Amino acid sequence: MPDDHKPLAGRTMIMSGGSRGIGLEIAERAAEDGANITLIAKTDQPHPTLEGTIHTAGERIEAAGGAVLKFVGDVRDDDAVARAVEQTVERFGGIDMVVNNASAIDRSSTDALSMKMYDLMQDINCRGSFLLSKLCVPALRESARNRRNPHILTLSPPLNLDPRWAGGQLGYTIAKYGMSLTTLGLAEELRADGIGVNSLWPRTTIATAAIRNRPGGAQRFARSRTPRICADAAYLVLTSPGQDTTGNFFIDDDVLAEHGITDLDSYRVTPGDGPLNADMFL
């Protein structure tokens, strides 16, 4: 029986990406309960501008209390993702949670966006989320039969049809909304199985390398919240009853508020009550 105080103890999560940033924080939060974590990530060696590798992430997960399977692979590679799923089931006995975290971003206008980058965003964001979710469905159904509360959680925004989001960055919007449509469709398709399928998106920009490395990034970084707010919100979603919590597009601070957490000062990069940057698509 699960520990009521550590509901993810012994549960198994498979995540795309996770070498750093929001994904790693989500994995660490689950590891604090004693969860098993598989990371599918490409960063095997240190990157010149991005901190962390799959190996340093694995060390942090183990230090937090979790068991980790580090799978160096690309979510664009069907065979590699299939092997990661198979090895996860072999190592940990099943899969209870899928977190679609891997994402590529280029906010260029249509005329400036190369088709190579367009394809990369489609392949990682939309197709990668569909592929990992699809390959995990049999294991998630087995988890549901065993009453282990399975979930799919995708880091993608609400389907906001305000034209300014498509008009400003069409290629990226298509890729991220493809992830969100995957949530919408799988939630309905898997509803009868009792598998929770949801998306999570931050209210504000999150202090990650992707923010810091952009032009003007230092100021935006200072006006952001830390990745821990997404991790705490993800934890609350993943520990909720999947059969009753599905088809939602959650915003991180809304999730916390629903659980009585309204003092968010600890999540600020810069203490105080100064302005925060709103995230995209809201």
Regions found by a protein language model. Name each.
Residues 1-92, 105-106:
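Short-chain dehydrogenase/reductase
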Residues 30, 94-96, 180-184, 190-202, ...:
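Conserved Rossmann-fold SDR core element
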Residues 108, 163-164, 195, 203-215:
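Short beta-loop-alpha junction of Rossmann-like oxidoreductase domains
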